[in-house]
Amino acid sequence: MEIGGFFPYEPTLETENNYISRTCPDADDVAHLMSGRCSIYYCLQDIMLTDKKRVAYLPAYDCETVIGCFVKAGYSIYYYDFDNNLVPQFDESLIPKISFLLICGYYGYSTFDTEFVKKCKKSGVTIMQDTTHTAFSPIGACKDADYISVSLRK
């Protein structure tokens, strides 16, 4: 089977893993979509109803399809870099300029600065966490995230 190819149906196990309740505190507000790209754009469509500024702060280390969602939605973009341990190097001086922050973990670990996320949230910045690489991490999702997006196929 090729990457990104067809996934045949398989019956679910009788024992539930409670993934949704662990990652989404409000499990009644969940949409199942075709891909991570669709998920991010779906969230952006909701955010754009109130976000007139449309300035995003995204990880410099991200795939083109994720960035494309923001371009398609008409967002201006700032990028944050990472150190050698994949810890984001956020610039606090950008908080007043941005309206949206995308956080994510890599290789199963969320290394972002939760205090920076809290400062953004307090300043009215919408927070989205992409949990594609940390979906099954026992740490769970960031409690300050307004939106959580995941591609379970990856």
Please provide the spans of the model-predicted regions.
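Short, well-ordered alpha-helical microsegments
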Residues: 39-41, 63-67, 110-111, 135-138
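Conserved PLP-anchoring active-site segment centered on the Schiff-base-forming lysine
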Residues: 44-93
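Hydrophobic anchor at the start of a short beta-strand
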Residues: 30, 77, 127
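Amphipathic coiled-coil/heptad-repeat helices and related helical stalk/stem segments
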Residues: 16, 36, 40, 63, ...
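Generic structural signal for beta-strand residues in well-ordered domains
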Residues: 23, 32, 48-49, 70, ...
